[in-house]
């Protein structure tokens, strides 16, 4: 068979897509086509910020049916989503309540309890995962303490991509890359950690052993009656994005830029030293036994909220106005937990500037300038931190995901980091999803083989650092004095 058709379901925190990939194995060409796009947003349910999971499932099925109705024979399906959130099921496999979003405030004050009762170094020694107040470990603790009546009904807990795979196939699976984001997987055994899980109050029987990417979970029966394999891809969207990052060598770092920015490097070994703990470095699971050694950055969430609040629809025009403004007049720490989900992002940014005796951004362009400059400076700090951790400098940074379309931010990043930036591909999560499917179908050998396909089929844009730019001069003057505040650590 010369052609393969694979479908990637890629769910983000603000939107979802069903994408069709066509791979020509003879010429090693890979094309993507968007079949269906839909909105994903939070809703208030009984006082909690929850996901409209039934609407998401409806749109996933609609997208799959659209492909089938075109007469295309699908070879496989894969699903990737964000991490940490989960869906509860009873003994009959029916949903118990609605999944609560990681942005809900129910976990407030929970993480400090764990640090006292288990110990920060002990949690890190076991999991190797960064401390974020919304990690699944703290969500489950909040669930069992705050909603015992719900807990009593639970027989299974599935992470988001595993839930949708279950709904398509009837088979349960706990995919490894997403499971590691929970802070509940033991970094030495790749299985759930008994001590950490016991602290949450959740039962170990709710979970099956995590499985690495590349296994077939089960089949979805399409409207025409064909049985289509559903593959457990690297179901954490960042894990998929990293798979599609055309990293040239060990001196390349990556930045997955979207609602969240995740900056890191690939490693065959985890970094769980005291230095890594102090820097709140995470060691999330990747494909082929690789670790994604990285740090979370609040990312373009701040901009997305400002755009929504200000009802801005012309982003290119805003970026053009922003580019005309001087750099580094308004600076915030994007990783301050005050920006996780404020009632008014614009007001929160202004308050942060006011509290640090800076000018206050008023116009939309000034707010955007504040966000872009602040992100670029944080990128520079974290890249320096990662280089120190591994004892080697990076020579290149690959920016992938939707945020890599922002040419202003890309150049600011290159200037602040003092490093060459390669931007693209945009559809990194979708491509990485497809890559694992093609490996499972025996069309590709491994991740490195797939990256060669990505490099050959997708154009990258190069940004050369300008040492004379305003932000580069700012870094040269102030970076030795700057300290990176950890996101909610």
UniProtKB/Swiss-Prot annotation:
InterPro entries: ATPase_NBD (IPR043129), FGGY_C (IPR018485), FGGY_N (IPR018484), Rhamnulokinase (IPR013449). The keyword Magnesium applies. It holds the Pfam family FGGY_C. GO terms for molecular function: ATP binding; glycerol kinase activity; rhamnulokinase activity. The active site is at residue 237. GO terms for cellular component: cytosol. GO terms for biological process: glycerol metabolic process; rhamnose catabolic process. Its EC number is 2.7.1.5. Its cofactor is Mg(2+). Signal peptide: none annotated. Substrate binds at residues 83, 236-238, 296. Disulfide bonds join 68-222, 353-370, 413-417. Gene3D superfamilies: 3.30.420.40. The keyword rRNA processing does not apply. Keywords: ATP-binding, Disulfide bond, Kinase, Magnesium, Nucleotide-binding, Rhamnose metabolism, Transferase. It catalyses: L-rhamnulose + ATP = L-rhamnulose 1-phosphate + ADP + H(+). Pathway: Carbohydrate degradation; L-rhamnose degradation; glycerone phosphate from L-rhamnose: step 2/3. ATP binds at residues 13-17, 259, 304, 402. Belongs to the rhamnulokinase family. Involved in the catabolism of L-rhamnose (6-deoxy-L-mannose). Catalyzes the transfer of the gamma-phosphate group from ATP to the 1-hydroxyl group of L-rhamnulose to yield L-rhamnulose 1-phosphate. This is Rhamnulokinase. The gene is rhaB.
